[in-house]
């Protein structure tokens, strides 16, 4: 049986067909003859096949291969093969939103830093993910506390497998190790998770505001990127709305600390109380995190800080914004010299390799006696800026983002109460988002119903014009054309009204979906919709 040209140049579709034995070569007469016939000439798969994972989850039936069907087999298109096969679930059923992630709650920083994807690489990652056989859309949320991949998957099981293997390939971490630390969430659970993340409920520091800015950045970077499609972009845009609403309508952000402020608190906890103000402070990196560290040091009474950065421009801007603290700029090549004169060194750069190693630190002079001669490195970067080997130096103490749990463990009861306030909003917004996704299902039917009516209109108009002859003037032609369009639009008005729904009312949505299925059956639109999905998949694969 020849495969339709619709599949040519679409490896993803060909892979689906071949993987699930849907290619012509897979349907040999010998395999058919070995399968016993059931009632009414229906061929039932053997019992041991009924429990097979993947596509065959329920007993499936195949029509017996009669001589008539065999003679007609060559005329069946590839589309009809797919519609009558197990692969139909990939195109007829709604795809799933899936989260494959590792966070500070499930994986150590040593693993997260290997998985981290710089923001500049997000578009490339989205393109690679959408090139996988069972992935339609994708987004990456990579921060110091989490590495999460959001996808729209044709198949949950196979999509997760492909993404996990991709993560292993890009990070060098074995699949088995990733599986030990990853978490998987599907559809409603995935929706609730990103809403909780955006609201600051899943952060190490409850209610911290930086994560909302990071979610916004996912949308900003994703705009115009093939693969950051309607479902995933809609999910993240709704998550931004949730994050704003939670912070506006609850007091979750009141008194909340950020990762940077927690880092300052941790450093002060480790210093003798008498030296909290006099300790010499150095901040490596003048980005958002570094700026917040300086801000919180000033709030704690620090009057002087040395800031090491690649350029002086950002440091000057911070100096103007914070006149209450003396900020001394030093270039990056003086980093070790600055560290040798500091008691506490905060690191917050985007460097993908450590800035401080054991050989850099072991020859530095001891910190001042006021802090016990110990130099404290507080590293809030992922990947880490301070190698774990620095902790082997007798006069050095190293802390990373995972150590901030010691700071935020306090006030647990207050954190839980604030989280409960936010959960009410998140539950409400999750329901609205799922309803919006449901309402999207009617869009293909609306398009195909209009196209169906337009084909009939054009065909009948051509018949009418041919009967009227060549001597018809332009005015009459235009009038007849307008008449045909008016009739079609009036005829479609009622069905279209019953197909449009914003998802805000569950009862209305249910009725809308019933109307959609009825119209699909009456006008045979499912085949057209399926063809459109196949075409979209082919185009996505070719990009």
Curated annotation (Swiss-Prot):
Annotated spans, Disordered: 20-44
A biological process from GO: chlorophyll biosynthetic process
Binding annotation for substrate: 143-146, 203, 208-210, 214
Pathway this chain belongs to: Porphyrin-containing compound metabolism; chlorophyll biosynthesis; Porphyrin-containing compound metabolism; protoporphyrin-IX biosynthesis; 5-aminolevulinate from L-glutamyl-tRNA(Glu): step 1/2
Induction of its expression: Circadian-regulation. Up-regulated by light.
Residue range covered by the transit peptide: 1-61
Binding site for NADP(+): 285-290
Active site (UniProt): 144
GO cellular component: chloroplast; chloroplast membrane; protein-containing complex
GO molecular function, one term: glutamyl-tRNA reductase activity
Localisation per UniProt entry: Plastid, Chloroplast membrane
UniProt-listed Enzyme Commission number(s): 1.2.1.70
Site (Important for activity): 193
Tissue-specific expression: Strongly expressed in photosynthetic tissues. Detected in all tissues tested.
Comp. bias intervals (Low complexity): 23-33
Keyword vocabulary terms for this entry: Chlorophyll biosynthesis, Chloroplast, Membrane, NADP, Oxidoreductase, Plastid, Porphyrin biosynthesis, Transit peptide
Catalytic activity: (S)-4-amino-5-oxopentanoate + tRNA(Glu) + NADP(+) = L-glutamyl-tRNA(Glu) + NADPH + H(+)
Key word Plastid present: yes
Subunit-structure text: Part of the FLU-containing chloroplast membrane complex composed of FLU, CRD1, PORB, PORC, CHLP and HEMA1. Interacts (via C-terminus) with FLU, only in the absence of light. Interacts with GLUTRBP and forms a heterotetramer of two GLUTRBP and two HEMA1 subunits. Interacts with CLPF.
Notes concerning its domains: The N-terminus (65-92) is required for heme inhibition, but not for activity.
Note: During catalysis, the active site Cys acts as a nucleophile attacking the alpha-carbonyl group of tRNA-bound glutamate with the formation of a thioester intermediate between enzyme and glutamate, and the concomitant release of tRNA(Glu). The thioester intermediate is finally reduced by direct hydride transfer from NADPH, to form the product GSA.
Record family assignment: Belongs to the glutamyl-tRNA reductase family.
Protein's job: Catalyzes the NADPH-dependent reduction of glutamyl-tRNA(Glu) to glutamate 1-semialdehyde (GSA). Probably involved in the tetrapyrrole synthesis required for the chlorophyll biosynthesis.
Protein name: Glutamyl-tRNA reductase 1, chloroplastic
Source organism of this protein record: Arabidopsis thaliana
Gene that this sequence comes from: HEMA1
